Amino acid sequence: MRKIKFFDTTLRDGEQSAGVNLNLQEKLEIARQLERLQVDIIEAGFPASSKGDFEAVKQIAETVRTCSVTGLSRSVRSDIDAAWEALKGGAEPRLHLFIATSPIHMVHKLRMTPEQVIEAAVEAVKYAKRFFPIVQWSAEDACRSELPFLAKIVTEVIKAGASVINIPDTVGYITPKEYGEIFLYLRNNVPNIENISLSAHCHDDLGMAVINSLSAIEHGATQVECTINGIGERAGNAALEEIAVALHIRKDYYQVETRLNLQEIKRTSNLVSKLTGMVVPPNKAVVGKNAFAHESGIHQDGVLKEKTTYEIISPELVGVSSNSMVLGKHSGRHALRNRVEELGYTLSEEEINQLFVRFKELADKKKDVTDDDLIALIFEEKFDHFKDFYQLSSIQVQYGTNQIPTAVVVLKDGKGNTIQEAATGAGSVEALYNTLERCFQTAVTLLDYRIESVGGGRDALAQVFVKVRVNDVETSGRGTAQDVLEASAKAYINAMNRMFMIEAMRAENEKVTTP
């Protein structure tokens, strides 16, 4: 049975989603979880693009041991050199080279002739092979390329040493039948193609990324590039979880196998959703909240009698467990640590101690602390602290049906200075955000504001997600608290702290690149 490799590009292509800005710690946590999921390859970033990306790729390569870590590179020596410096400490360093091959890209973007593009691609592969044992080569915009030219350049880069050939549907333009035919054409017209791996990379602009990827597998691809939850530029990329479960459930049809640990899918999906701020739609296949919900009476009756009447995927297959433990105010540190580990999270001793304090505070306010509550606290403790920037000290909001809503906010900056401001607004949240804007002394555009409950009940935690824009930079933030307004303030501050982190990284990059 053929084996299909999963190439996860959540940390590179996925992070290019509008408003997604992951810090180093968040990228490392996602990489560790992808390793638990047992993807074959993690594309950790684009090392030559910035100092921050370089450092993230380097640390991920040095941390992950059971997956191959790769980085993206243009067909230029300086990019390849940067990628090698970042990836050489990995367990199995590999490089992902690309150059555009469609007429529109060659003429308008590269301004190169087809012969010059072939020469650049071959030279880059040969140079990369001096360092990397595995070189993957991608034909950017392959699906709008002329097939004879595509076959010609693929032939030449294979001769130069490329061992993986990736055929991206860069703009999400192709149909399943056409995409499969490209793979058949290459298999029939490229010498020695049986000695290399063919890879698929699909975007979802026309809603066909997953089915196109499956078509590629049917027509000879042995690797698929995808992202968790299908995040990515524009309409996103092919969703890893959908391809993986389709191959598993329909193994009778596809006749392939993977090394993925499918029980880690739901946990991975939740992690990526929380850290990116991109909420998974309830009706999302495989990982959506409603994926295993049956509302129709006929369906409910059938499932109660025999699950397989209407449930082709068992929740347990992807790690959705009904085994939820409830902790309370009498639960100790040992019980907390055990449950954290059972939920699949790794925390340091210091993080456990800090989490225990927050857990006790919540347990005093709530009768029961559920797994959802605990996960929310873990995220807040592990990822939402930016000690060098701003932290919330207190908020006070005054509201009445016949009064003008007013907010008072007290913040502390990284140097311990106290900042206090007050402002009004049309509603409580607007008053709060107007006050915070005064605290930061920066014009901020609020692009999105979403709130959801963590678990059920009147005492449930509130989780708020925001997306903001300052000048040309968009970023997201999240906040958790029992009070909606406190959660709203935390989310806004979290987004602004990320903004200041991005600005600091930009300033550092300018120092590095300035002669």
UniProtKB/Swiss-Prot annotation:
Catalytic activity, as annotated? 3-methyl-2-oxobutanoate + acetyl-CoA + H2O = (2S)-2-isopropylmalate + CoA + H(+)
Q: Which pathway is this protein assigned to?
A: Amino-acid biosynthesis; L-leucine biosynthesis; L-leucine from 3-methyl-2-oxobutanoate: step 1/4
Q: Where is the signal peptide?
A: none
As cofactor, the record names: Mn(2+)
Name the record gives this protein: 2-isopropylmalate synthase
Query: Which positions fall inside the Pyruvate carboxyltransferase domain?
Result: 4-266
What species is this protein from?
Answer: Geobacillus thermodenitrificans (strain NG80-2)
Q: Which SMART domains match?
A: LeuA_dimer (SM00917)
The UniProt annotation puts the region (Regulatory domain) at 391-515
